[in-house]
Every structure is written in C-alpha cells, then in structure tokens.
Curated annotation (Swiss-Prot):
It comes from Mycolicibacterium smegmatis (strain ATCC 700084 / mc(2)155). Belongs to the LpxL/LpxM/LpxP family. It is found in: Cell inner membrane. This is Phosphatidylinositol mannoside acyltransferase. Pathway: Phospholipid metabolism; phosphatidylinositol metabolism. The active site is at H126 (proton acceptor), E200. GO terms for molecular function: acyltransferase activity. It is a peripheral membrane protein. Keywords: Acyltransferase, Cell inner membrane, Cell membrane, Lipid biosynthesis, Lipid metabolism, Membrane, Phospholipid biosynthesis, Phospholipid metabolism, Transferase. Catalyzes the transfer of a palmitoyl moiety from palmitoyl-CoA to the 6-position of the mannose ring linked to the 2-position of myo-inositol in phosphatidyl-myo-inositol monomannoside (PIM1) or dimannoside (PIM2). Its EC number is 2.3.1.265. It holds the Pfam family Lip_A_acyltrans.
C-alpha cells in the first residue's frame, strides 16, 4: 500500500522522521540534544549492540565478534549518535566560527595541489563527522563537489541534498542526473577544484576488489580513475572525534603514475585501514562491509 499513491508507507515514515529530526533537534538546547542522542546510543548498545557493527569491528580489532569489547561497541554507537546529532544541528550552527575553530592537520598537501593547478580528489571513509570537514573546506576554500546516493523515496533524497547544499556543497546524484557524475567530477578537477568522495564501500560489480583488514571487500573505482584521467592529486583524508571537538587530517598524495586502478585503490584501502584502526569507535559502518557478510544471492551477483 502506498501513501498518496506515490511513496511506500515505510519510505514516507522515514522521510518524515528525518524532517522532524532536522526541525526538532535544531531547536533543542545542546545539553538536551546530547542527552537524547546519548540515551539512544545506550539503548542501541543493549544486548551486545547491532550484530553487523560487531562483525565489522571484529575485523578492525582482530578478534572474533563475540570478543569485541562491549566498551568499543558503546563508544562506536555514541560516536554514531553524535554524528547524527551534529548533522541535525549543523545547518543552524555558525559556519564561519566553525571554519575558524577547526584545524585540519597537513592541509598544505591540498593547498599545494591547488596552487599547482591540478585539482584534488579527497577520498574519505565514513568516520567522525565528514560533513563538518566539508563545512571547514567551504569556509576556508569555497564550494566543492561531492556525490550522493539516490535514496528512496525521492523526497528523502532531496532532503539530504538540500541539507548538504545548505552547507555550501555542490551535490551530484549518483544516478538519474542530467549527466554522469564522473563526467562532471572530471570537469571540476580540470577546472582546478576539489572534490570529496566517500570511498570505502562499493559492494557492486563496478567496485574494485581489495584486501581490507585481511579480508576481501570492494571499494569505489572512482577516486583512482578520476585522478588517472585528469592528473588530479588523490589524497586520503580521515576525520575523527577529538573530545568535544573534531580531528581531521589530509594524508600525502597517493602515487597514481602506474595507471593501475586496482593497485591505487588498494593503497587507499591500506591508508583507510591504518586510520580506522587508530580510531575504531569513530568508523560509522553498520552495514555489511566485506563480501563474506553478503547473502548468497548478492555474492552470486558479484560473481564471487
């Protein structure tokens, strides 16, 4: 059954839930918002927390899922809740002040690439608050371009696009746009602009198979392909939470001179793994990350 003949009930409820979150959480006093999201994280951590989160963190810490410390599960869910609390409140925060407060370690890597007229691909995992990093970049450089998955229903997708556009991001749809996103991203790089791509998960046929914490997964080919095609610098970036603040770092440019997409993506995976191992609680991955965790049907579609 659909609501108004257009949107499935589940999708409508999800969309309305996000709409309420952006409206209500933004209006809450900060202490109240922290209390609400903290309570939600503690509730989610009951009985060992989400099984997929536990399985993912087991790879990071090198232990069986049952031996992943409960403290890490609780810290991970608290970090995830903090991301969403900040996401709901970020549009109303003072972006200029945030741009002055935040400090990005080794940002000169990025500035040097842009000074040389090369453009830059910033590749990130889902860690810390990547939207906050985007706000910093907008305030200290200007708009950049990113890509968003086309969520269902369309109203939910539009809500996320409008949220990120309100922060100063240019957002391209992964599918269904007027032009393929790769084409537009390549143009931005040729124009010596930065692009930011979430880059640790692409469990589709187009993903590049890599070793990640000793096990096979697939990651997007886009960062490597864009750097090869345009000559742009490819930088791994990591975000994490630092007490009540935010940690962000740009790592040295990856060598893309080989033109080997698989080798370059593996180098990116290795950098991500080292960073996630350092800040495991701040890696927000509650979905299957490794091929072994997929259903038989999905593995068959991948040809594995």
């Amino acid at each position: 059954m659909t609501l108004s003949g257009r949107i499935p009930l589940g999708g409508q409820v999800t969309d309305l839930g996000y709409a309420a979150g952006w409206r209500l959480v933004r209006a809450m006093p900060e202490a109240m918002a922290q209390g609400v999201f903290g309570a939600g994280a503690r509730y989610a951590a009951r009985n060992g927390g989400p099984e997929q989160l536990r399985r993912n963190l087991a790879r990071v810490v090198g232990k069986p899922p049952a031996d992943v410390p409960d403290d890490l599960i609780r810290a991970s869910l608290a970090s995830y809740a903090r991301y969403w609390r900040e996401a709901f409140r970020l549009p109303a925060m003072d972006h200029g002040r945030l741009g002055e407060q935040l400090d990005v370690i080794d940002i000169d890597h990025l500035w040097s690439a842009l000074d040389a007229g090369r453009g830059a691909v910033l590749a990130l995992p889902h860690s810390g608050n990547w939207d906050m990093a985007g706000v910093w970049l907008v305030q200290n450089y200007g708009p950049f371009t990113t890509v968003a998955e086309r969520l269902k229903p369309e109203s939910l997708y539009r809500r996320f696009v409008e949220y990120r556009e309100s922060l100063g991001f240019e957002v391209l749809p992964l599918t269904g746009g007027e032009r393929p996103p790769f084409e537009v991203l390549a143009e931005r790089l040729t124009d010596n602009r930065p692009i930011c791509l979430m880059a640790e998960r692409d469990l589709t046929r187009s993903g590049v198979q890599v070793d990640f914490f000793g096990e096979a997964t697939r990651m997007p080919a886009g960062p490597a392909k864009l750097a090869i095609e345009t000559g742009a610098a490819l930088f791994p970036v990591h975000c994490w939470f630092e007490g009540d603040g935010w940690g962000m770092r740009v790592y040295p440019e990856l060598d893309t001179s080989s033109g080997d997409v698989t080798a370059i993506t593996q180098a990116l995976a290795d950098r991500f793994a080292a960073n996630i191992a350092t800040y495991p609680a701040d890696w927000h991955m509650l979905q299957p990350q490794w091929i072994a965790d997929l259903s038989d049907e999905r593995r068959a579609r991948l040809g594995t």
